[in-house]
From Swiss-Prot:
In cyanobacteria the RNAP catalytic core is composed of 2 alpha, 1 beta, 1 beta', 1 gamma and 1 omega subunit. When a sigma factor is associated with the core the holoenzyme is formed, which can initiate transcription. The N-terminal domain is essential for RNAP assembly and basal transcription, whereas the C-terminal domain is involved in interaction with transcriptional regulators and with upstream promoter elements. GO terms for biological process: DNA-templated transcription. It comes from the Bacteria. Residues 1-229 are annotated as: Alpha N-terminal domain (alpha-NTD). The keyword Transferase applies. One of its GO terms (molecular function) is DNA-directed RNA polymerase activity. The gene is rpoA. This is DNA-directed RNA polymerase subunit alpha.
Length: 312
């Protein structure tokens, strides 16, 4: 198998602090670039954990269609601005940020007070504009998660009349593109290719770390396949026939035969099916007359037992 390497050939940071990394992976055997590209892209776009704003509480507001006196943006605009925040929380539990501001003021992401475990990537992101003589109080909930989580209208949090839920996008990777160069990558090499990947993140993680995390997830996914365990199927025991479940009392045996069998711990037809004719004769006080009586009773219900232990 070819030993390939991955090189980051470009890295850019945009004004909104989003990051773009371009990687070149190769040399690869023909077909491997598509396998790697599709697998990495799927994990990068939907499998990485990230942070997102999941709810906002605005003082004096109890629904998203309201307006706030002295604030240029309406509630829906403020919720959208909060949803678009690039944020990174190292706390697996809920984090709550707070803002108390007075106008005139343009509120930006950096004005929200979080604990030291929360980093706001783009601190210049505008949130709201407050006019002179007016105030704005916000409470912003931040959680960690994977993928996309819609608002659950039946959750306990949504029953709070003043807590405005937001459908959360936890995905730290915004875009992944890849192309395949099918030309030879070394002199004399044929049938080889290279994979070129462009990874764009929201800035809460770097493209390098995103690639590494995606690769580790794929390793964990495929590692168990390296050791295939043979599982021996345990045959199912056949269910006993209805006749075998008939209790001894229903065979209408003589009192002597019945009592001898009960003392031998024979309680049903199923127990009798483990005996041969010779076995019956070995039961204490059980003679050939009683044994013949049992044989006849079993034959009446369509069951026969062997004459001897060695009979087939």
């Amino acid at each position: 198998m070819l030993q390939y390497q991955i090189d980051r050939i470009d890295h850019q940071i945009a004004d909104d602090r989003s990051q773009t990394g371009t990687f070149l992976i190769g040399p690869l055997e023909r077909g491997q670039a598509t396998t790697l590209g599709n697998s990495l892209r799927r994990v990068l776009m939907g499998g990485l954990e990230g942070s997102a704003v999941t709810a906002v509480r605005i003082a004096g507001i109890n629904h998203e269609y309201a307006t706030i006196p002295g604030v240029r943006e309406d509630v829906l605009d403020i919720l959208l601005n909060c949803k678009q925040l690039s944020i990174n929380s190292s706390n697996p539990e809920l984090e709550i940020g707070r803002l108390v501001a007075s106008g005139p003021m343009e509120v930006k992401a950096n004005d929200i007070q979080f604990s030291s475990q929360v980093e706001i990537v783009d601190g210049e992101k505008p949130i709201a504009t407050i006019q002179e003589g007016h105030n704005l109080e916000l409470e912003i909930h931040v959680e960690r998660g994977v993928g996309y989580r819609p608002v659950d209208r039946k959750s306990e949090e949504t029953t709070a009349i003043d807590l405005l839920q937001i459908d959360a996008v936890f995905m730290p990777v915004k875009r992944v593109n890849f192309t395949i160069d099918e030309t030879a990558v070394a002199e004399g090499a044929t049938g080889r290719e290279r994979l070129k990947m462009e990874v764009v993140t929201d800035g809460s993680t770097s493209p390098d770390d995103a690639i590494a995390e995606a690769a580790n997830q794929l390793i964990e996914l495929f590692q168990p396949l390296a050791t295939v365990t043979m599982v021996e199927e345990i045959p199912e025991e056949p269910e006993p026939s209805p006749e075998a479940q008939i209790p001894l009392e229903e065979l209408n045996l003589s009192v002597r035969a019945y009592n001898c069998l009960k003392r031998a711990q024979v309680n049903s037809v199923s127990d009798l099916m483990g005996f041969s004719y010779e076995d019956l004769l070995e039961i204490k006080n059980f003679g050939s007359k009683s044994a013949d009586e049992v044989i006849e009773a079993l034959e009446r219900i369509g069951i026969s037992i062997p004459q001897s232990r060695t009979s087939v």
